[in-house]
Amino acid sequence: MRSLTLVLLILISIQAALIMGGHTQAQASANQHAATQNSPRLYSQSKEDLHYDELIPTVDPKLFNKRRYRSPRVVFSDVITAEKEMGTPRRPRIRRKANDFLHRGEYSVCDSEEHWVGNLTHATDLGGNEVMVLPHFRINNVVKKQLFYETTCRVKKPIGAPKPGQGASGVKAGTSSCRGIDSKHWNSYCTNTHTYVRALTSYKNQIAWRFIRINAACVCVLSRNSWRHGLKY
């Protein structure tokens, strides 16, 4: 009786060992197959990252040693963050007065919006040349990003289906009329105005500081209606 029990225990242990060995082998083959499938993707991804790193230009650190005028609308960061998380540049605080309630109900002639631009690649300098802006550059083996703080006219979203030529973004800057303007006697539209800021650019394979033009405000442009049109009213 004891011998029969021992034989059964030996057979059960052998069967369990075979099952575990087969499961381990199947798992190893599955892992190897998955690694074989993922290896081309990882290789292609690493190859793309390597190619992207090669395209980032290297900047001489001496360019940042000179103390020159720097615009608050230009920021250099070695932490690549989203433009929405950057916030707005610091502005002087305005102390409120007791008669501030008298100014309630005032509206801007044109609505504007402010945002950070981190993918600016081309711009116009003071000489009218089309220069290449460096959105990324390497300095002291550290990759930094160049960000610009722009103010543009707010784009109105169309009600219903967009008109041909407008797309999903709505009315373009320069096509919306100004607020509070008498349309019987005046033609008006909101448009972007520009300012020049000092940025790191490349022109004719030479990296240097140059003043480039970016959007800085949204203003109203007026033009008087024709004399005949005015006589009708």
Curated annotation (Swiss-Prot):
Give the GO terms filed under biological process for this record: cell surface receptor protein tyrosine kinase signaling pathway; modulation of chemical synaptic transmission; negative regulation of neuron apoptotic process; nerve development; nerve growth factor signaling pathway; neuron projection morphogenesis
Where in this chain does the entry annotate a coiled-coil region? Answer: none
Q: List the disulfide bonds.
A: C110-C190, C153-C218, C178-C220
Localization terms from the record: Secreted
One GO cellular component, as annotated: dendrite
Quick one: signal sequence residues?
1-19
Propeptide at which positions?
20-97
Q: Which UniProt keywords apply?
A: Cleavage on pair of basic residues, Disulfide bond, Growth factor, Secreted, Signal
Q: Which GO terms describe its molecular function?
A: growth factor activity; nerve growth factor receptor binding
Chain ranges passing through the membrane: none
The keyword Zinc belongs to this UniProt entry's keyword annotation: no
Q: What is the annotated role of this protein in its UniProt record?
A: Recombinant ZNT-7 was able to bind to the human p75 neurotrophin receptor/NGFR and to induce tyrosine phosphorylation of the rat NTRK1/TRKA receptor tyrosine kinase, albeit less efficiently than rat NGF. ZNT-7 did not interact with rat NTRK2/TRKB or NTRK3/TRKC, indicating a similar receptor specificity as NGF.
**Family affiliation:** Belongs to the NGF-beta family.
Kindly provide the name given to this protein in its UniProt entry: Neurotrophin-7
Q: Which organism is it from?
A: Danio rerio (Zebrafish)
What taxonomic ancestry is recorded? Eukaryota, Metazoa, Chordata, Craniata, Vertebrata
Name of the encoding gene: ntf7
